[in-house]
Amino acid sequence: MALYPKAVLVPVTIVASCVCLSVVSTAQISRTDPVQVKPPLLRTIDPPSPDAAATDLEKRADELHGQKLYFDAIDYYRAALGKLSIPADQAKILNKICRTQLVMTRWHDGKKTCQQAIKANRKFPDPYNNLGVALYEEKKYGAAIKQYRKAIELDDSAASFYSNLGAALFSKKKFEESAKAYQRALELDPDVFERSSRQGVQAQVPRPEDRARYDYTVAKLYAKMGFSERSLEYLRKAMEEGYKDFKDAYKDEEFAELRKDKRFTELMAMKNPALPE
């Protein structure tokens, strides 16, 4: 006689409970799984037209650069470059390519392109400045200073050249020379620290430990020139950064007039944990 396993009757409520538990368990697991987000749709830019004039291609490249579409901008700049035969015109476009590469932090590529621009027109100051920026970002401050000085020799009216020179000198801890360069930059353009250079990337003080002293130096320069609002702004930054000699503001001659301003008194009275006693 054949033997069959006895059928076991399971209450429906138990089965339903198991199903519910399974669903709950699955739901709990799904919440721990990584959620895959689809990448955003890429913005497509039409390639440069082979029939477009160099000026139109350059204008479009400038627009793309302004929109931060840097790869597309470079494509258009290179297309414009291919239509030019005069070295001075080529240098202008090469400098713009260099500028875009620097914004993208492609320092090596930027250096090579700047050098090509200099070779095309050695009387054009901007690529010297931009080459200096690339060297500065590589912490080659001495080499950067050399390039900034070359740019200034060719054009001593560009505030950004002096500002960049000041930053490189500051990083070399040549503070007096740095202050002179910064002062000249401010004389040429009081807004120089608020903007980038006309065809390049304005250098900044890289090390956090230098930032407080930099802000204090700029505050002194603005105070000396009578720009109270901006002096107080940078003085506040220096305080917040914990500048160790902040109390020198009570005696530095550059702040003589500013000390008569009640806002100076209020600022100095502020209690800030970062401010050394």
Map each language-model feature to its residues:
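Short coil turns that delineate tetratricopeptide repeat
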Residues: 51, 85-88, 122, 156, ...
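Alpha-helical segment of the N-proximal tetratricopeptide repeat
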Residues: 52-83, 92, 99-103
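Start-of-helix register in tetratricopeptide repeats
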Residues: 55, 89-92, 126, 160, ...
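Structural signature of tandem alpha-helical TPR/SEL1-like repeats
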Residues: 69-75, 92, 103-116, 137-150, ...
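Conserved structural position within tetratricopeptide repeats
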Residues: 82-85, 115-119, 150-153, 186-187, ...
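Canonical tetratricopeptide repeat
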Residues: 93-96, 130, 164, 198, ...
